């Protein structure tokens, strides 16, 4: 039987030198305060009419997993993705992936029976593992057969978000969040409380750093006032006309696995229906997990994902395209522009209007980012080209990337909205897409 037990916290398990310096953290909140690091696990809030307030953060908790049963260990799977190389340890599993960096590989014990184990297998002889992703596999010629069950002991460190809160009495207090391997939530507030900052513990860290501090600088994404006609009136006139008149309107959401969840487009449709009560909206989805728009365009006739048959052939009035996977392609700017010019010509030929949905932020190192705050500007070439292409060609752009880039200002580490810890947004993450789409219709009358 698998058991998971909290053990010691990391500050007891990982040695480090005592910290004596104090690091200023630039940033203000609704109460015009300032957050400072004053120790390895100590923060100080200075602001308001009382204080300063010094608070101690509990170090991340180690979770021990004992006697996890595996019916068999697979052979090594050749893959550039660490979460696919072997058996995924239960503690670090998130959706179809595992969470990188959460697994404490020094803790791993693979044995023939539960408990102390009749036989303890040897890494490098009987099995091996990916220390970052928490996957393991048997080695040919070792003592573990291909059909043999094994029992596994391991430890991992989940994420946690604590909140610095100003309460009704004018005091600052710390609320500790609930640990979760991929999506730690923020602590709930009581009436009269204001969240000043969040402290994100992303896994096994030995001390707090500036990148763990997320002051609440904004309560929501700052919508820029539109100069001139509303976006939908200017860029989506036929769609808007059908929404107002009650003529049938067919919307096609086209994309990859993110679109395949059928979340953001459903929320968008529900909003449109409420905004335009007489509208007759039909929503279709064409989604291909793990693929790109390049893959769609390369599919032959008769394929389940043939572009001309499945996308153009649906004869939509409006297409919403979402391709986070396109952002990972190693392409030149000219290649991106050429493909989107082809798409635009195809859509205009059949009289279809188009909304380009920019992708969300994904695992930071996949984007060339080193942290989850101070990241307003998306560094990906693909996103920059989409913005420029849509502006030049007068295409509606729902800029979800821009909203994701400012989540840190709301005290939210964006990766905590990913169900798989990489690139699959949860419902809150999909709502950001929906809000990006809805913003295009801000100011458009319903009649």
Q: What kind of feature is each model-predicted range?
A:
Residues 179-235:
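Polybasic, proline/glycine-rich intrinsically disordered low-complexity segments
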Residues 229-253:
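Membrane/wall-proximal cationic-aromatic binding patches
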Residues 143-158:
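Extended Gly/Ser/Thr-rich low-complexity repeat segments
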Residues 3-133, 139-140, 157-165, 170:
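Extended beta-strand solenoid/passenger and fiber regions
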Residues 59-61, 138-146, 177-180:
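Secondary-structure transition/turn motif
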Residues 248-265, 289-293:
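Catalytic nucleophile-elbow at a beta strand-turn-alpha helix junction centered on a G-D-S/GDSL motif
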Residues 158-160, 266-282, 291, 297-446:
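Alpha-helical cap/lid subdomain in secreted, periplasmic
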Residues 128, 284-286, 398:
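General small-molecule cofactor/ligand-binding pocket signal
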């Amino acid at each position: 039987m698998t058991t998971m037990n909290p053990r010691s916290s990391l500050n007891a398990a990982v040695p480090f030198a005592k910290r004596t310096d104090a690091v200023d953290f630039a940033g203000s909140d609704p109460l015009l305060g300032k957050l400072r690091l004053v120790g390895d696990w100590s923060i100080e809030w200075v602001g308001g009419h009382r204080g300063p307030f010094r608070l101690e953060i509990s170090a991340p908790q180690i979770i021990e997993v004992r006697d996890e049963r595996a019916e068999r260990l697979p052979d090594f799977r050749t893959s550039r993705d660490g979460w696919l190389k072997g058996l995924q340890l239960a503690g670090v599993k998130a959706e179809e992936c595992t969470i990188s960096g959460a697994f404490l590989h020094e803790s791993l014990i693979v044995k023939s029976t539960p408990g102390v184990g009749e036989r303890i297998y040897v890494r490098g002889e009987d099995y091996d593992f990916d220390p970052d992703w928490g996957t393991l596999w048997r080695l040919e010629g070792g003592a573990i057969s291909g059909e043999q069950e094994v029992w596994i002991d391991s430890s991992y460190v989940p994420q946690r978000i604590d909140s610095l809160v100003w309460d009704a009495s004018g005091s600052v207090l710390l609320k500790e969040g609930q640990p979760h391997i991929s999506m730690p939530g923020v602590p709930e507030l009581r009436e009269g409380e204001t969240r000043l900052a969040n402290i994100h513990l992303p896994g096994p860290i030995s001390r707090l750093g500036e990148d763990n501090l997320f002051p609440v600088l904004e309560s929501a994404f700052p919508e820029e006032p539109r100069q001139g006609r509303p976006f939908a009136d200017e860029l989506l006139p036929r769609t808007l006309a059908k929404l107002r008149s009650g003529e049938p309107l067919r919307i096609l959401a086209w994309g990859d696995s993110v679109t395949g969840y059928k979340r953001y487009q459903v929320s968008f449709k529900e909003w449109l229906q409420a905004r335009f009560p007489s509208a007759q909206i039909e929503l279709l989805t064409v989604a291909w997990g793990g693929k790109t728009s390049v893959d769609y365009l390369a599919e032959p006739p008769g394929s389940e994902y043939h572009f001309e048959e499945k996308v153009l052939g649906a004869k939509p009035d409006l297409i919403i395209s979402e391709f986070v996977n396109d952002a990972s392609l190693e392409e030149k700017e000219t290649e991106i522009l050429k493909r989107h010019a082809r798409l635009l010509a195809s859509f205009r030929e059949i009289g279809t209007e188009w909304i380009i949905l920019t992708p969300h932020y994904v695992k930071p190192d996949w984007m060339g980012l080193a942290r989850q705050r101070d990241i307003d500007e998306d560094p990906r070439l693909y996103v920059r080209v989409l913005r420029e292409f849509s502006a030049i060609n007068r295409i509606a752009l729902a800029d979800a990337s821009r909203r994701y880039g400012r989540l840190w200002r709301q005290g939210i580490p964006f990766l905590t909205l990913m169900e798989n810890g990489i690139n699959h947004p949860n419902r809150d993450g999909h709502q950001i897409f929906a809000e990006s789409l809805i913003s295009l219709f801000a100011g458009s009358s319903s009649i």
